[in-house]
């Protein structure tokens, strides 16, 4: 019996000071309260960032829609401005009463902002225009190529040199003379002398009874 008691006492030896300290620290640690990390501030920041980003996306989209609408309006305005109005169409043609032009006289009318010469030619002028040698012309054209009715010569009153307006019934050939640089045109409006390279231009026109419609 004594031997057994001795063995038991041997098994339960007193704890050392170091062991007691470790156990005490473990108990204190187990009793201490660990704080759970608070993510509210982070979540709030993320939510604020998401809201800001969503607002930015909304503004970009809205500006895109406004830009598209503005571009569409601009295109529609541009196209509508290109559509010819009644006034513009009226200016595209000009009607002249030929009965009001005396024989051997010129009139000047305005067509699309350009002067148009209309000459009521005499029989002598018609004969003179047809008697010209083509080899003597800088820009060869017969009179028949330049008129629809021999007694009516209709052409643009713009010098083919630099765009000045020639003077009627003047020059060395009894037709038109450009005072800017000295070009002379005959009674058919053909260049005969001076720096102009071409004859006076013939516009599109048609006769309608006693009237002519230019354009």
From Swiss-Prot:
Its EC number is 7.1.1.8. It catalyses: a quinol + 2 Fe(III)-[cytochrome c](out) = a quinone + 2 Fe(II)-[cytochrome c](out) + 2 H(+)(out). Processed by both the mitochondrial processing peptidase (MPP) and the mitochondrial intermediate protease (MIP). Initially, MPP removes 22 amino acids from the newly imported precursor in the mitochondrial matrix. This proteolytic processing is then followed by a second proteolytic cleavage by MIP, which removes an octapeptide to generate mature-sized RIP1. SUPFAM superfamilies: ISP domain, ISP transmembrane anchor. The chain crosses the membrane at residues 51-80. It is a single-pass membrane protein. Residues 81-215 are mitochondrial intermembrane. It is an enzyme of class 7 (translocase). GO terms for biological process: aerobic respiration; cellular respiration; mitochondrial electron transport, ubiquinol to cytochrome c. Changing residue 184 to R: No loss of activity. Changing residue 161 to R: Loss of activity. It comes from the Eukaryota. Residues 90-93 are annotated as: Hinge. Its cofactor is [2Fe-2S] cluster. PANTHER family: CYTOCHROME B-C1 COMPLEX SUBUNIT RIESKE, MITOCHONDRIAL. Component of the ubiquinol-cytochrome c oxidoreductase, a multisubunit transmembrane complex that is part of the mitochondrial electron transport chain which drives oxidative phosphorylation. Belongs to the Rieske iron-sulfur protein family. The Rieske protein is a high potential 2Fe-2S protein. This is Cytochrome b-c1 complex subunit Rieske, mitochondrial. It comes from Saccharomyces cerevisiae (strain ATCC 204508 / S288c). The lineage of its organism: Eukaryota, Fungi, Dikarya, Ascomycota, Saccharomycotina. The gene is RIP1.
């Amino acid at each position: 019996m004594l031997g057994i008691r001795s063995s038991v006492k041997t098994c339960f030896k007193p704890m050392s000071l170091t062991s007691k300290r470790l156990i005490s620290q473990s108990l204190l640690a187990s009793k201490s309260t660990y704080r759970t990390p608070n993510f509210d501030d982070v979540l709030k920041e993320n939510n604020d960032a998401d809201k800001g980003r969503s607002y930015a996306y909304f503004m970009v989209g809205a500006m895109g829609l406004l830009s598209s609408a503005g571009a569409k309006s601009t295109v529609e305005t541009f196209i509508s401005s290109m559509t010819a109005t009644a006034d513009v169409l009226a200016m595209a043609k000009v009607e002249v009463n030929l009965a009001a032009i005396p024989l051997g006289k010129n009139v000047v009318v305005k067509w699309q902002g350009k002067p148009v010469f209309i000459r009521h030619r005499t029989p002598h002028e018609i004969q003179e225009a047809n008697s010209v040698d083509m080899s003597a012309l800088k820009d060869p054209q017969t009179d028949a190529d330049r008129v629809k009715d021999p007694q009516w010569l209709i052409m643009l009153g713009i010098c083919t040199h630099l765009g000045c307006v020639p003077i009627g019934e003047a020059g060395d050939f009894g037709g038109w003379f450009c005072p800017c640089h000295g070009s002379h045109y005959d009674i058919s409006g053909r260049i005969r002398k001076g720096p102009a390279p071409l004859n006076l231009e013939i516009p599109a026109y048609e006769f309608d009874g006693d009237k002519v419609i230019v354009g």
